Structures are given as C-alpha cells and as structure tokens.
C-alpha cells in the first residue's frame, strides 16, 4: 500500500512539471558569418561577458546588459503575450531578470524583421508611464513597461509586467534568431523593479514548487527543455548535488577549483561562478582561459574564433570544475564545439575586477553536461549528469 502511495505521489509530481521546449538554432554569430558581416560587426561591437553582470549597481532604473553577449546564444523557446495571444521567440536567460519583446512602437529595421507586440490588438493590455532602457554597443534599446497575459508553456499569467521596445538600433538585433529575452534571475537585478516572470508564477500559485530546471540537449534541433515548478529525473543520472547560492541576484555559487590532469590551473583559493543559460560559452579569467587555449592547441582565426583541429578532440583532457566538494568533469567533446568539419573552443576569456576575486560563467557548454535545478525556495542549485 505504501509503495502504491509513493508511486502515486511520484506520478503526481511528474504531472505538475510544466515543460517548455527549447529549439536549438543558428546563433547570431553564425548568421553574421554566413552573410560575411561578422568582421564589420566586431569593429563596432565588442562582446564582453563582464558587462552583463557588473554595471547594474551604477544604474537604479536602467539596465545596462550588453546585448552583444547574446552573440552565441543558440537555445530559444516560444511564449505568447496578449489576448488573443501573440507569439515570440525568446532566450530563457538565468543571467537577467526582465521580460521584453519588440513592439509596434518600434520602427527600426531590426524590429521590422522580427515579431512585434501590438498592444492595440490585445484586449487585456494595460499600459504604464514607466520606461526601460538596455544599452549595447553604439546605442540602446529603449521601451516602455506594460502589463498583459503572458503564456509560457501551459502556464498562463494574467498580470505580467514586460518591456515593449521602441528603438533597437544597430546590427545586434538585425539578424538575431530571437525576438526578446525572458529573464530568470532574482528580482534584485530587475530593471525598473519589474517583477520577473517566474516570481509572478510563484506568487500567483501557478507552479507547485518554487523552482525550475533546465535540460539542454546536444541534439542539433530538439530535446531541450525549461521545466517550471518541478524536476523530471528522467533527464539526469545519479543524484542531484546541491550548491548554496552565494549571491541572490544572479545564480551565483562558490567554486572550489578548476583543474586539468589533477593540477589546479585556476580558482586555486576558491572563486565565484555564475550559472547562466543566456551565455553560450564557458567564460573565465583571460589569463586562465588563455593558458587552457594554449594547452589544448587552440588559436585565433581572422574572425576571432579559437579554432582547433577536430582530430585532436579524442586526445584532449577533461577540464574539472570542483564545486561544493564534488568534481564536475567537462570532456573535450563538450568544450570543443564541432560544426561540420570545423571545430572551435567553447571557452572565452574576460577580465572582471570584483571584491570576490576571479569570476567564471558556466554557460551552455557546462549546462549541456549537467542538468541544472534553480531552487528559489532554498536558494540553491542542483547539478547532476545529464542524459
């Protein structure tokens, strides 16, 4: 009888996980390469992962996320806004907290080439006088805030605040394979104090657990998911290892060390790391990343990519990240990105001056290997080997 009850509870827990499929598409970088525009783009837009995380203390109501940092984003999902629903392709980004999409208020070419939310076509839209601005490159995305029904998978939130863009200058969005961004970080870093989507889901009782989880498939097109309100154990092996969040803004944790072949190569006295679905690559201090690139034989090409011979993958060592006493090895098949006959390093350097010392960003390169649970109720991350 007890076993029947347990099985019933397990079945119930699976039923209340709201799964949102993600599709893997060509990144903005790949689109620009195909059109022969990447070199021109990089002359005026310099991707710097650090700018996504540290200018926010300077601006109380203006978000200063550098949108060039979505240059390599590949995983996208569909949401709808309004009544009747208007569909948008977005990045589910654990490294930011705002939801915004292009709108009919925007007349720039970048907006014209993407889906635009039309508030006049929604019977449930409520406007505000509040503004939103996100700076990037040579200009900024400016917009206004409004409320409407937002549907994410099977979850319908009837009172969600979001940004409607009015200007989107430059090439950053012209060829972007997404319309907007849905932030899943903590509300403390939300621009204009806008309540993040997941916080609203929980506050309104739309999910049964105050957590969400992410599975990123290595499949070229399908299989990836964001799961709201629960955990599906069929997407990982072994047990989840829990890591306390060290800063309740980003999904930031303390990492013990980074090693190769048993030798510590970085983060010798522990360091901070941010687990970020909105960052495609694995990012660390420039000196440490440069040493790793040299070790694995990667060298920059004319487009600034760190290329490597595909034949070397089988002979390269694991990069081991030790977190909360548990080792998380990253094999070369994970940190070397292969497309057709070309191979590039999935590692990227950045310099950040923080009071906590060196900082690493564990992006999609890491998350593809490790199923990740973002547990807001207990302010912790769960990690387990992905299937």
Swiss-Prot record:
Domain of life per record: Eukaryota
Any single GO BP term: proteolysis
Residues with Phosphoserine modification: 129
Signal sequence, start to end: 1-15
Subcellular location: Secreted
UniProt GO molecular function: aspartic-type endopeptidase activity
Main subcellular location: secreted
Record-annotated Peptidase A1 domain positions: 75-384
Disulphides: 106-111, 267-271, 310-343
Stored InterPro entries: Aspartic_peptidase_A1, Aspartic_peptidase_AS, Aspartic_peptidase_N, Pepsin_A, PEPTIDASE_A1, Peptidase_aspartic_dom_sf
Cleaved propeptide residues: 16-59
Active site: 93, 276
The protein's Enzyme Commission number: 3.4.23.1
Keywords: Aspartyl protease, Digestion, Disulfide bond, Hydrolase, Phosphoprotein, Protease, Secreted, Signal, Zymogen
PANTHER family listed in its UniProt record: BETA-SITE APP-CLEAVING ENZYME, ISOFORM A-RELATED, PEPSIN A-3-RELATED
Annotated function: Shows particularly broad specificity; although bonds involving phenylalanine and leucine are preferred, many others are also cleaved to some extent.
Protein name: Pepsin II-4
Natural source organism: Oryctolagus cuniculus
């Amino acid at each position: 009888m007890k076993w029947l009850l347990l099985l019933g509870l397990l079945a119930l827990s699976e039923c209340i996980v709201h799964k949102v499929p993600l599709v893997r598409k060509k990144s903005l970088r790949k689109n620009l390469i195909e059109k022969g525009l990447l070199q021109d783009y990089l002359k005026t837009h310099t991707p710097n992962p650090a700018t996504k995380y540290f200018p926010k203390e300077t601006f109380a109501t203006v978000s200063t996320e550098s949108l060039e940092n979505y240059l390599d984003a590949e995983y996208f999902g569909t949401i709808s806004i309004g009544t009747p629903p208007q569909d948008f392709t977005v990045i589910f980004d654990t490294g930011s907290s705002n939801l915004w999409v292009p709108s009919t208020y925007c007349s720039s070419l970048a907006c014209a080439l993407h889906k635009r939310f039309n508030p006049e076509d929604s019977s449930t839209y409520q406007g505000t006088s509040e503004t939103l601005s996100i700076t990037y490159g040579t200009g900024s995305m400016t917009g206004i805030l409004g409320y409407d029904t937002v549907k994410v998978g099977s979850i319908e939130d009837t009172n969600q605040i979001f940004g409607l863009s009015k200007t989107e200058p430059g090439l950053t969005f012209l060829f972007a394979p997404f319309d907007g961004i849905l932030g899943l970080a903590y509300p403390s870093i939300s621009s204009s104090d806008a309540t993040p989507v997941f916080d609203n889901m929980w506050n309104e009782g739309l999910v049964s657990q105050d957590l969400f989880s992410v599975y990123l498939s290595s499949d070229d097109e399908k299989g990836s998911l964001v799961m709201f309100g629960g955990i599906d154990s069929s997407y990982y092996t072994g047990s989840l290892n829990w890591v306390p969040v060290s800063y309740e803004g980003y999904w930031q944790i303390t990492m013990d060390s980074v090693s190769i072949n048993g030798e510590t190569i970085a983060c010798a006295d522990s360091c901070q790391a941010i687990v970020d679905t909105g960052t495609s690559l694995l990012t660390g201090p420039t000196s440490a990343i440069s040493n790793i690139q040299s070790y694995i034989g990667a060298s920059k090409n004319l487009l600034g990519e760190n290329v490597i011979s595909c034949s070397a993958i089988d002979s390269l060592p694991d990069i081991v990240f030790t977190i909360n006493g548990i080792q998380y090895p990253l094999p070369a098949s994970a940190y070397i990105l292969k497309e057709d006959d070309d191979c590039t390093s999935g590692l990227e350097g950045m310099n950040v001056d923080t009071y906590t010392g060196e900082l690493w960003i564990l992006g999609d390169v890491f998350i593809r290997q490790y199923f990740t649970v973002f547990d807001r109720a207990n302010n912790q991350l769960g990690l387990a080997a992905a299937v």
